[in-house]
From Swiss-Prot:
Coiled-coil region: none
Organism of provenance: Lachesis muta rhombeata (Bushmaster)
UniProt-recorded name of the protein: Snaclec LmrLEC-1
Similarity annotation: Belongs to the snaclec family.
Transmembrane parts of this sequence: none
Length: 40
């Protein structure tokens, strides 16, 4: 099960964030998201 606002695909949870970020800021942002989130 994925958190509210997230989508499931092949057993993984994904969510699109539209705010532009550089790589370092995006990585920090992802670490604040639910467990097992990945920077894509």
């Amino acid at each position: 099960d994925c958190p509210s606002g997230w989508s499931s695909y092949e057993g993984h949870c994904y969510r699109v964030f539209n705010e532009p970020k550089n790589w370092a800021d995006a990585e920090r942002f992802c670490k604040l998201q639910p467990k097992h989130s990945h920077l894509v």
